[in-house]
Design a protein with these regions (language model features):
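Glycine-/small-residue-rich active-site loops that bind phosphorylated ligands and cofactors
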Residues: 1, 173, 200, 227-229
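Conserved HGGG/HGGXW glycine-rich cap/lid loop of the alpha/beta-hydrolase fold
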Residues: 1-31
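Alpha-helical elements of the RecA-like P-loop NTPase motor core of helicases
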Residues: 3-7, 162, 240
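Generic recognition of short, well-ordered alpha-helical segments
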Residues: 4-8, 100, 206, 210, ...
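Conserved catalytic core of Hanks-type protein kinase domains
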Residues: 12, 214, 232
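Flexible "cap/lid" subdomain of the alpha/beta-hydrolase fold that forms the substrate-access gate
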Residues: 20, 25-57, 63, 70-196, ...
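Catalytic histidine-centered segment of alpha/beta-hydrolase-like enzymes
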Residues: 226-235, 239
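C-terminal alpha-helix
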Residues: 241-247
């Protein structure tokens, strides 16, 4: 996925917010990473921290959904000096890594050579296959057009396929990383909002409740009629609760 995940949310936020939505190298990026780039989950967290540094952002409301929420949790454990508050939106947590059926299939595809991986991913050109539970079917109810666009770089660019395989191998190499990250969350002393899809079939709703209980200054909001990718399924509701939280 890329930054377009947040288009609907950003468009629905009240005026006055400066919104910056980076595209991390999660297989929908258009420019290949350097061969020595660290594409593990901690490496992606450091990349995001560097992004905040380079833009010299302060008192950031950092929002993460799906894998983005896992990256935010790692930053929370590291202190995240530039972050004033966080929003965790239906995301990987605790022992749900790789997440659900979708994540487990992705982890297996990451074991393929890039050429074979590319041939396998060609199936995602077809909407009925994208809508399967092992693809995007359990991640979003309404976002098929967006997910089809996300697939273009990995379908068209060999260098992005190589990055995708590297990312999948690196991020899923450590199956307990989010269990350890959760142990550090009680030390996060800034406000947190946990937003979870009540119908989520990939990220257990019980994990949303656990995160809200674990983080000292956190509250939980549940969103109906949505799967994991709430920014696609319910952008208006998510924008409203983020706006209320960020003040």
């Amino acid at each position: 996925m890329d930054a377009s995940l947040w288009d609907g949310v950003i468009a629905s936020l009240p005026a006055g917010y400066r919104c910056v939505a980076p595209t991390l190298p999660l297989a929908a990026h258009r420019h290949a990473m350097n061969a020595d780039a660290d594409l593990s989950l901690p490496g992606l967290a450091r990349l995001l921290a560097e992004f905040l540094d380079r833009l010299d952002l302060h008192d950031v409301t950092l929002v993460g959904n799906d894998t983005g929420g896992a990256i935010v949790q790692l930053l929370m454990g590291e202190g995240a000096d530039r972050v004033g508050r966080v929003v965790l939106v239906s995301c990987d947590a605790f022992d749900n890594w790789p997440p659900g059926l979708t994540g487990k299939v992705l982890a297996l595809t990451g074991k393929l050579p890039p050429l074979v991986f590319g041939l396998f991913m060609q199936q995602m050109r077809l909407r009925p296959l994208r809508r399967l539970p092992v693809a995007f079917g359990w991640l979003t109810k309404r976002g098929d057009a967006v997910t089809a666009r996300w697939m273009r770089p990995v379908l068209r660019q060999a260098e992005i396929r190589r990055d995708a395989v590297r990312v999948l191998r690196a991020v899923f190499a450590d199956r307990d990383i989010l269990v350890r990250a959760a142990e550090r969350l009680p030390g996060f002393g800034r406000p947190a909002l946990v937003v979870w899809a009540s119908e989520d079939r990939v990220m257990p709703p019980a994990h949303g409740r656990r995160l809200a209980e674990l983080i000292p200054d956190a509250r939980l909001v549940q969103v109906g009629d949505s799967y994991t990718l709430i920014p696609l399924d319910q952008p208006g509701i998510l924008a409203r609760v983020i706006g209320e939280f960020a003040g």
